[in-house]
């Protein structure tokens, strides 16, 4: 009988990436097949996020539902991973003694051994350590699911913003070696992936080892990824302004594979609040980065993150945030009301902004962002946009759907063989959450670099050291 695995994932794209790796790993080691139905599963895994308000209570609420399944099937294994697991550790079992496995973001590769241990002596396992880069060495080969893929290039963050739990739950910054990253992307390209999204909590701080022992920069890595045949679109998230150096901006000037869209969190437009947040940059420095980016890539669009109602934020501080939003002319952005995360310095600050005031500020900010995003969309009317076709449209299964460089969903009439390829589409209609268009050019008419396969690139550039060990030299 086929053994089944159910994974519920909350949080960021890094968590989505981690969950996909868990599924691949347990399929390779135990033959577990994914199921969307928790009641069918032999193993239930909850991959948690601690960023949002009441994250811990949300976890225990979900575990309470799974407890009923455990009572019906005592052999069911329940595991909790992610940032809440890293933060709470043994406390999870104190409140939910039926949980068998607690693991952190850096120990998910040990899941096969943890499951074997629980199956063997029924003893619970808790492993929330930080074994640095070992996780990536233990994961199976990547499996593509469509024309886009996430690739984690680093873990952790050293910035210690006062409101953020990431350095405590995922550890400090650790970068993967460049050849490991490039080989994973080449494997994905060989399976039909055309767009990669490079992931990290502070992705532009990547400083990975090169094949010759030197340390590469994020700008170096972007150019190496762009050189992989078959990869025609590169995204990355999430960035920190303090690490957004001029060499990265130069990549926007000369590397067309890098999309004309950037998510660069700023959180506030007030220097006083930025200082309280521990952001280590000013609003003016942020705007200087945007000015240089637009000089290098005039059509680039910027999205961001904002926190309203941070302790000590005055009406004047909020107005400075609104001015920054207008000055930069942000596109789609994420915004949240401040809520203290246990264990962070901000949790000890006096939360002195009334709740109703926080809600009002959030409403005003989101209305302005939505207006600007809609204006950006309207500018696209009548233009020709390059779309990576991801599959059938959610609105109409007789149509296709894909995304523009600036992350707009576009629905259009097409043929099945277009899926997984690029098409140029003229935008004919603009809606609040999507665009509509008609195909004006197929990939065969674009002259993209698909003549040389990733396998041939690897074979051509593979070298051996004096011990006969092969390595990939781009």
UniProtKB/Swiss-Prot annotation:
Domain of life: Bacteria
Function: Catalyzes the methylthiolation of N6-(dimethylallyl)adenosine (i(6)A), leading to the formation of 2-methylthio-N6-(dimethylallyl)adenosine (ms(2)i(6)A) at position 37 in tRNAs that read codons beginning with uridine.
Name assigned to this protein: tRNA-2-methylthio-N(6)-dimethylallyladenosine synthase
Lineage per the UniProt record: Bacteria, Pseudomonadati, Pseudomonadota, Gammaproteobacteria, Enterobacterales
Domain MTTase N-terminal: 3-120
Residues in TRAM domain copies: 378-441
MF terms in GO: 4 iron, 4 sulfur cluster binding; metal ion binding; N6-isopentenyladenosine methylthiotransferase activity
UniProt cross-references to Gene3D superfamilies, sorted A to Z: Methylthiotransferase, N-terminal domain (3.40.50.12160), tm_1862 like domain (3.80.30.20)
Organism listed in the record: Salmonella arizonae (strain ATCC BAA-731 / CDC346-86 / RSK2980)
Gene giving rise to this polypeptide: miaB
């Amino acid at each position: 009988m086929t053994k089944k695995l159910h994974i519920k994932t909350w949080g960021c794209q890094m968590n989505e990436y981690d969950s996909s790796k868990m599924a691949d790993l347990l399929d390779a080691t135990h033959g577990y097949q994914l199921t969307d139905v928790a009641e069918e599963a032999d193993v239930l895994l909850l991959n948690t996020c601690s960023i949002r308000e009441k994250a811990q209570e949300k976890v225990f609420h979900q575990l309470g539902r799974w407890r009923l399944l455990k009572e019906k099937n005592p052999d069911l294994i329940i595991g909790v991973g992610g940032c809440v697991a890293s933060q709470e550790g043994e406390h999870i079992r104190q409140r939910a003694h039926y949980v068998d496995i607690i693991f952190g973001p850096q120990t998910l590769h040990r899941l096969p051994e943890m499951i074997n241990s629980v199956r063997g002596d029924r003893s619970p396992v808790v492993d929330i350590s930080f074994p640095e880069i070992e996780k990536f060495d233990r994961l199976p080969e990547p499996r593509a699911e469509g024309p886009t893929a996430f690739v984690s290039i680093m873990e952790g963050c050293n910035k210690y913003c006062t409101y953020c739990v990431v350095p405590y739950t995922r550890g400090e910054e650790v970068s993967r070696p460049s050849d490991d990253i490039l080989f994973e992307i080449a494997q994905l390209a060989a399976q039909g992936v055309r767009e990669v999204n490079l992931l990290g909590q502070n992705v532009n701080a990547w400083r990975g080892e090169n094949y010759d022992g030197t340390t590469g920069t994020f700008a170096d890595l972007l150019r190496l990824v762009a050189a992989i045949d078959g990869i025609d679109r590169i995204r990355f998230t999430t960035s920190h302004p303090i690490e957004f150096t001029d060499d990265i901006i130069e990549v926007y000037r000369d590397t067309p594979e890098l999309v004309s869209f950037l998510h660069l969190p700023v959180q506030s437009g007030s220097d006083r609040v930025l200082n309280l947040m521990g952001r280590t940059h000013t609003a003016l420095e942020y705007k200087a980065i945007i000015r240089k980016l637009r000089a290098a890539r005039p059509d680039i669009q910027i999205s961001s993150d904002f926190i309203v109602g941070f302790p000590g934020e005055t009406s004047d501080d909020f107005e400075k945030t609104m001015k920054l939003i207008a000055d930069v002319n942000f596109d789609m952005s994420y915004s949240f009301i401040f809520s203290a995360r246990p264990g962070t310095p901000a949790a000890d600050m006096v939360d002195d902004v009334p709740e109703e005031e926080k809600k009002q500020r959030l409403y005003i900010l989101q209305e302005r962002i939505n207006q600007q995003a809609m204006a950006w969309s309207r500018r696209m009317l009548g233009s020709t946009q390059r779309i990576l076709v991801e599959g059938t449209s959610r609105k109409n299964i007789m149509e296709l759907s894909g995304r523009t460089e600036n992350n707009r969903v576009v629905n259009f009439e097409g043929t099945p063989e277009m899926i997984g390829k690029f098409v140029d589409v003229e935008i004919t209609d603009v809606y609040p959450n999507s665009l509509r268009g008609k195909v004006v050019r197929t990939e065969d008419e674009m002259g993209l670099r698909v003549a040389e396969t990733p396998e041939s690139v690897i074979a051509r550039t593979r070298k051996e050291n004096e011990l006969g060990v092969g390595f990939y030299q781009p």
